[in-house]
UniProtKB/Swiss-Prot annotation:
Name of the featured protein: Anaerobic sulfatase-maturating enzyme homolog AslB
Active site per the UniProt annotation: D298
Protein's organism: Escherichia coli (strain K12)
Stretches assigned to the Radical SAM core domain: 3-250
Binding, [4Fe-4S] cluster 1: C21, C25, C28
Statement: the UniProt record of this protein carries the keyword DNA damage: no
Amino acid sequence: MLQQVPTRAFHVMAKPSGSDCNLNCDYCFYLEKQSLYREKPVTHMDDDTLEAYVRHYIAASEPQNEVAFTWQGGEPTLLGLAFYRRAVALQAKYGAGRKISNSFQTNGVLLDDEWCAFLAEHHFLVGLSLDGPPEIHNQYRVTKGGRPTHKLVMRALTLLQKHHVDYNVLVCVNRTSAQQPLQVYDFLCDAGVEFIQFIPVVERLADETTARDGLKLHAPGDIQGELTEWSVRPEEFGEFLVAIFDHWIKRDVGKIFVMNIEWAFANFVGAPGAVCHHQPTCGRSVIVEHNGDVYACDHYVYPQYRLGNMHQQTIAEMIDSPQQQAFGEDKFKQLPAQCRSCNVLKACWGGCPKHRFMLDASGKPGLNYLCAGYQRYFRHLPPYLKAMADLLAHGRPASDIMHAHLLVVSK
């Protein structure tokens, strides 16, 4: 009998709408993935594939563990509420009393009262894409017709709050917004947002090989390429995070939860929970496309990183395959010497392999493009992280660090 349960913890994120989206955000790396399925124009997950995903994912999970379903795109709301009602019903059918959770990333444009009532009823955690105030958000996040989307997203945010849906806000940090950290942060706080994640936008223009597949953006690899005009500069990303951290630690500890800070604290105290790109290895978070194809990672949806198909192979076969094992282990094995001797290695771990397309000081490939920014950020944090860890160890809340006699922000 084929092995059903993978050897170690894992996660499978679904993209039921494929790359289909109702927006045309300039910096999106996934819209163009439709080129990979040109021979099969249907890009929405059908009932058979949905059932296979739910059934196989639950079967592959240890009985004592929560089964965490994540729905992303493209834009997952394009499938309509009926699709997710069926997904929840299938989870109940195959879950047999298991603890099951759902999270959902959306641009928010199609959310209405009916959607939000459903999301609240079934305890979905919603990730809403919002880049900050209108002048920042609307620069790159536009409709197919090029119209701004900020008002539509703010309407969605209001609806999520009205229906008490658990949500966080996902903020893409681009070349423009990186220069306005407090404008972005304060706008979100003023809008009532409590959970925030900052995502650096880094993309390169396609080389000839990638362009032949109909793609405009560079595939991951160690070849340097021309950056897109919206890609954040490394030093500015570091300064962006430091500015927000300094602002947060003076007034918002225990009130606003910035995932980039949470991950840094987890690594500092040796706790689980840090994001994959700041772990020594990766490869345990795969994605399933609309037709059941499984890929090594959300950022590696390219033919050479396809692991198989949910209709033909078990999750265990694919995620424990030699190909995927090597993919995950290479995150550490291919670290250049400069990273291995770096004093923030255990905070950074080289970042996401997708961004390792620079040469290190000795001319060796594999240095993360964001290295300078990560160094700035991770070298700034330790005194504060230690102070918060000490407070917690003595039974005091981390928010006590905001008291004037404990807080000295470096200049």
